[in-house]
């Protein structure tokens, strides 16, 4: 079924969203570069205010996000598809799982997989450091910050974007999820504000990741090639990301970028296996099991632990508040990616896959590298601990230096980090371009020049933050800039829930019997005629004749009668899509602010079953004339129907639609408005 909201217009920017967000970000970037001391002071004071005023809110919000996602997946809404009912997943289960697996990998994992466990072990938020309990607590906090809570934010945004875009053909933007609440007002200031908040939050999240990546890579290159660990080298790495994005746009190597992303998975797994078998394998496997048990046992208590009576303010700002804001900032970016690869899957499949598969990888990575780092410290690595705390970007390489073949492993780590870095920068520019564009359909991407612009903007912002106060500035601004979008996510939750409730009314209306009708002569087919219909496998010519002489006249009669009764009706015979031989018929009845009635007839091509005589005679395919409503295929075949029977089917579906509208209007809080079909 085609996108009913498809526009023939050329892709163009959304001027309000683009100029506002671009202006604010460029102004902020230049301010941090030109007025470093002032920027550092302002960021510090703002962070203190946000932490004191909204620290509790970040903890509560993160908890509500994961509760909402799990409840939706486990409820009856879990069977709703991200797309029309007849849609099938674009990717096999294995390919989809591999892409989810890759989504769990990033250069920040290399940075924090050693730095956080070591810091939490040496300076825990509560209790004494450098104890067995501190070691267990250190790994649980690390897993907690990279765990299910964060992935639930990605799942929430991906679920909302996929549902509204692929099921209701709305643009693949954040404002689409707010349509059930604000209706057509999302095309005005409300929608613009939401998209601006998404763009600003996303670019700061990406800049934080790239800033961490720049610092990490600069040190790796200095270890391998004696390249100075300097701001000039960091600026060169930032320039590299801009160049890669430009090449990706101008030479069409997007597919190559995706191949590099897949290569990252293999290299990352190789690093895990290297450390696992070069280290104390038995200890690491035992520690992995212990970490899982501790994570499960302590998860609920940690989720809402605000340390109210003895609050470690600096620790909260640097860790839990930073991570939750970081996940929030990245949620539009990753949510968009997850939505694009998950069309045709049910909400339950999507949520389970998104929560379990990527976290499985992060669990393995963090457990192997984190426990290896703690093992080194416990067995006399005091100098290693000090270096990992004071210079966290060195921790990962310092750990690899404890094993044989350091040059080789450090080279693999640097290549892996570099690939993560350039692919994240390129993908980030693409997503920001899409969020600031008016795309003609949900499968379109932003113009190339816009992607280059956002790549430059990301680079400037990253450079400005690093020049102001290094990684600390990036972390602090993420906590600040992630706050507005965290409020937007609650509106997304409300819009998604209200729209899913509509699915209940639709199902109930479909289950209600339509008015009984007497069987006519055409209904009482002889058994021979019925058998002939069942054994018929029509080709292109017969199907086209059926559409022109029976289906279209039937739809035209219904349309004329509805117009006589005051309805605004559109009837179209649309040309074949690319690669198809037959077009389709489209009947649209406008219903004001209620959901429009859509009735389409599509010729669907299938392979002839092998047990039939036709298959043995050489005919390989046949057509079914299937009916489609807005929510998808109805699964029936109109082939060999009479005109009266087609009219009856249209009226049956129209009556069900009116029942659905009646049920929806009777429901409490039925303010959900619908997009034009």
Swiss-Prot record:
InterPro entries, alphabetized: BCCT_CS, BCCT_transptr
Cellular component GO terms held in the UniProt record: plasma membrane
Inducing factors: By osmotic stress. Choline is required for full expression.
Keyword Cell inner membrane: yes
Main localization (coarse): membrane
Entry's localization field: Cell inner membrane
GO molecular function, one term: choline transmembrane transporter activity
Gene Ontology biological-process annotations: choline transport; DNA damage response; glycine betaine biosynthetic process from choline
Catalytic activity entry: choline(in) + H(+)(in) = choline(out) + H(+)(out)
Record membrane topology: Multi-pass membrane protein
Regulation of protein activity: The choline uptake activity is completely inhibited by the protonophore carbonyl cyanide 4-(trifluoromethoxy)phenylhydrazone (FCCP).
Keyword terms of this UniProt record: Cell inner membrane, Cell membrane, Membrane, Stress response, Transmembrane, Transmembrane helix, Transport
Transmembrane domains' residue ranges: 15-35, 54-74, 94-114, 144-164, 196-216, 233-253, 265-285, 319-339, 350-370, 412-432, 452-472, 477-497
Function comment: High-affinity uptake of choline driven by a proton-motive force.
Family: Belongs to the BCCT transporter (TC 2.A.15) family.
PANTHER family, alphabetized: HIGH-AFFINITY CHOLINE TRANSPORT PROTEIN, HIGH-AFFINITY CHOLINE TRANSPORT PROTEIN-RELATED
Protein name according to UniProt: High-affinity choline transport protein
Protein source organism: Escherichia coli (strain K12)
Gene: betT
